[in-house]
Amino acid sequence: MKVYLVGGAVRDRLLGIPVQEQDWVVVGATPEELLKRKYRQVGRDFPVFLHPETKEEYALARTERKSAPGYYGFICDFSESVTLEEDLARRDLTINAMAMDEQGNLIDPYQGQRDLEEKLLRHVSSAFVEDPVRVLRVARFASRFHHLGFRIANETRLLMYSMVKQGELAHLIPERVWQEWQKSLEEKNPEQFILSLRSCDALRVILPEINSLFGVPNPHQYHQEIDTGIHSLMTLRASSELSEEPLVRFAALVHDLGKASTPIQAWPKHHGHEEEGTKLIRALCARLRIPNDYRDLAVTVARAHLNIHRLCELRPNTIVKLLEQVDAFRRPQLFHKILIACQADAESCGKTVVYRQTQLWNEILSECVKVTPQTFIVQGYEGKAIKEAMHQSRVACVERIMTSWKSNEK
């Protein structure tokens, strides 16, 4: 029985970046042998075991043979005769198909180290086409390593394109699409996930709602980049510089989703795209089974972002209503996320003007939250009268703040 460190841990060691988790492959062993050594089996479709002390994953070396379309259509062989090279051959990219033995010697049958040096994301073999999830994984690794200068090898991109044309992506299950997309939202360059899928025509199949934004014009006076798809990616990029939270990044990306559905004859104007966008976001989240917290933040940003930008043009009553609608008084941290997504939208336009709205909205909120029910309860207010009195008091508060702003500008 021989044990090898494999996959991402080897790759990251060679890149000199922190190793998040270690996975191991066991060659020349049986499930019974590992169970005798107190390993605990957790794999359902093939034997994966947890080390009795470290709790790290140990998998028996295996081969995979395509037996049916889609992600689950494989027959696995994990007999004692399977070699390490055979196990590494089933992996997606050469940089993920390296191993180290217990003495630290590198086993690299598919030139992964060379591709690390050349900063290439290259498939291991033609078996790449057997698993449609690999298209998503390559796009995710592009988002992870873009800042290091990595790019997808031309031959791998062509293979991804052929998989799209052959309809392989139709077998992707919604949960796996979201799993890879969500992971990409946590990377340094989440926009590269979208760009990589678009470069092989996979975006049209996997995320048609986002793909349809490309080619939709924006008013030049507000958007120097003009194209809505490009603007959405610029907003995603800007949001990743402002926040590490994938919820915020997702909301930033889809905030203008409704622009592809506005009447073409009205372009480049997009009246009503906010509400149209909320419908598309809800449908997208339902289709891919995206968690409710992602959906709710994205819907709120899509609906409110224009009014957030136009703060100084709004009436005090409208401002208080907006704060009530987004639940800012009870959930100020949620409102903070909304403001970050809106700031990303504004800053993505390439303007050098500082986005003052974040500071101004926070100033209003910090004063308005000082208005509490107790003030009106002791005055004899009851029921809905308390809510209305609080609303009017907050409106008066906003009026005072805005008057102060105007006097300071003189």
UniProtKB/Swiss-Prot annotation:
Pfam families with a match to the protein in the record: HD, PolyA_pol, PolyA_pol_RNAbd
Binding site for Mg(2+): E21, D23
Cofactor notes: Magnesium is required for nucleotidyltransferase activity. Nickel for phosphatase activity.
Residues annotated as binding CTP: G8, R11, R91, R137, R140
Catalysed reactions, as listed in the record: a tRNA precursor + 2 CTP + ATP = a tRNA with a 3' CCA end + 3 diphosphate; a tRNA with a 3' CCA end + 2 CTP + ATP = a tRNA with a 3' CCACCA end + 3 diphosphate
Domain of life of the source: Bacteria
Annotated positions binding ATP: G8, R11, R91, R137, R140
Every HD domain range: 228-329
Listed EC numbers: 2.7.7.72, 3.1.3.-, 3.1.4.-
GO MF annotations in UniProt: ATP binding; CCA tRNA nucleotidyltransferase activity; cyclic-nucleotide phosphodiesterase activity; magnesium ion binding; phosphatase activity; tRNA binding
Keywords from the named record: ATP-binding, Hydrolase, Magnesium, Metal-binding, Multifunctional enzyme, Nickel, Nucleotide-binding, Nucleotidyltransferase, RNA repair, RNA-binding, Transferase, tRNA processing
BP term (GO), one: tRNA 3'-terminal CCA addition
Cofactor requirements of the protein: Mg(2+); Ni(2+)
Miscellaneous information on this protein: A single active site specifically recognizes both ATP and CTP and is responsible for their addition.
Domain comment as written in the entry: Comprises two domains: an N-terminal domain containing the nucleotidyltransferase activity and a C-terminal HD domain associated with both phosphodiesterase and phosphatase activities.
Family from the record: Belongs to the tRNA nucleotidyltransferase/poly(A) polymerase family. Bacterial CCA-adding enzyme type 1 subfamily.
Assembly and binders: Monomer. Can also form homodimers and oligomers.
Protein role: Catalyzes the addition and repair of the essential 3'-terminal CCA sequence in tRNAs without using a nucleic acid template. Adds these three nucleotides in the order of C, C, and A to the tRNA nucleotide-73, using CTP and ATP as substrates and producing inorganic pyrophosphate. tRNA 3'-terminal CCA addition is required both for tRNA processing and repair. Also involved in tRNA surveillance by mediating tandem CCA addition to generate a CCACCA at the 3' terminus of unstable tRNAs. While stable tRNAs receive only 3'-terminal CCA, unstable tRNAs are marked with CCACCA and rapidly degraded.
Full protein name: Multifunctional CCA protein
Organism whose genome encodes this protein: Legionella pneumophila subsp. pneumophila (strain Philadelphia 1 / ATCC 33152 / DSM 7513)
Lineage of producing organism: Bacteria, Pseudomonadati, Pseudomonadota, Gammaproteobacteria, Legionellales
